[in-house]
Amino acid sequence: MISGFVITLSAQDRSPAQFATSRFLRLYPTLWICVIFTVFVTSGVLEKNYSLSQILANFTLLNEYMGFSDIDGVYWTLKQELKFYFIILILILFGVVERYRIWLSIWLVLTAAHTFFNQPTFMGWFISPGYSPYFIARIGFYLFYRDGQSKFTHVIIFSSLLLSIIKAYEQANSFIVNPGDLEKTIAALITSTFFLLMYALTSGKIKINNKNIYVSLGAMTYPLYLIHSVAGKSLIEKYSGDFGYTETAIIVTLIMLAFSWLIYQYFEKGLVTPAKVFIIKQLRAYNL
């Protein structure tokens, strides 16, 4: 929900080329570093073998279309983000991105129809029906933050919340082994809590100071997310027998946090961000 808020914000007053450049540089360079890190760790620890073709295919996030599996399963969320990027890019291309009331209402109706009637069946071709409520909510929260309260934003956010609760209840099977009603209810409550938190942040009821520590912690979450699963778990499994599970988990967590900070501080902040600023500045200079 937070990333979608930022994506919608980044679409404002930008051309298609500027938006595509911004999103590409935000998503891919760090992904490449983290793919290499995961390959390095799992090759050494688990003695896994990856072909160069599989690694390069994962660099694109289109690896499944090329017949290659994910090196790390967490990449599935990035593929959902790519679809969202594409939708926003199309809206910018046609100059209708600011007509939120029209396309957001259509999207919400289609999502509700798919939730209750599994129609239209083609919806999954261009956007995930299962995660559309979260995408819609993030845009609703952005409008709430930018334009203030309105009946439209309240309807969008509340409707998205209801659909998200239904989806959380249904999708608990994907994350929990044989979940009962209690586990499904907890999943729905966690989802509702994130909605309340986003409401509090966008309405100004909770204010976070723009200090470097908060910026750094927030920025570290992306690389940390990309390396924590396969690489992190493989290290814990490999060395927990020698040092104890708890001790190994703590050490690996600290290593992952440190590496994530290094990626943010020296790669993203030091190289990628200046490159993005320069390229977008050049695109604007040439009216692209």
Language-model segments: residues:
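Alpha-helical transmembrane segments in multi-pass integral membrane proteins
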Residues: 9-18, 65-67, 91-102, 123-255, ...
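Membrane-interface helix-loop-helix regions
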Residues: 2, 10-12, 16, 21, ...
